[in-house]
Amino acid sequence: MAVPKKRTSMSKKRIRKNLWKKKTYFSIVQSYSLAKSRSFSGVSEHPKPKGFSRQQTNK
């Protein structure tokens, strides 16, 4: 015969929920800092040559 599970206490629920929130927060912070570092790293390493963006030929 099936026996119902015991109910999880509110404190355990709160602890687990806070752990889940903390993990997601740190993963968001880490991914944001990685995106920032990647978006600015390419600018300083390989600057774009100036004067080549608008080449026009006179006919």
From Swiss-Prot:
Coiled coil: none
Keywords of the record: Chloroplast, Plastid, Ribonucleoprotein, Ribosomal protein
GO molecular function: structural constituent of ribosome
Location of the protein in the cell: Plastid, Chloroplast
Chloroplast recorded as keyword: yes
Gene Ontology cellular-component terms listed: chloroplast; large ribosomal subunit; plastid
Record has Iron as a keyword: no
HAMAP family attached to this UniProt entry: Ribosomal_bL32 (MF_00340)
Family designation: Belongs to the bacterial ribosomal protein bL32 family.
Protein name from the UniProt record: Large ribosomal subunit protein bL32c
Organism: Oryza sativa subsp. indica (Rice)
Gene from which this protein is expressed: rpl32
